[in-house]
Amino acid sequence: GYVELGYTDDAPAVGYAKLAASTAGKVKTVTSGGAEYLVIKVDTTAGTVGFIM
């Protein structure tokens, strides 16, 4: 399903990205570990990312 969460560190790019849990229920982009998800929305103003799980 689709989910929107806050992100920490750098904003993920739209497309496939490796994401992992971060602090306070947010996610972050990682190069190793995590899982690959399809990112379809990035809102840098709100600090949120929407992706398909």
Q: Where are the language model's segments positioned?
A:
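Surface-exposed, low-hydrophobicity beta-strand/loop segments enriched in small/polar/acidic residues
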Residues: G1-M53
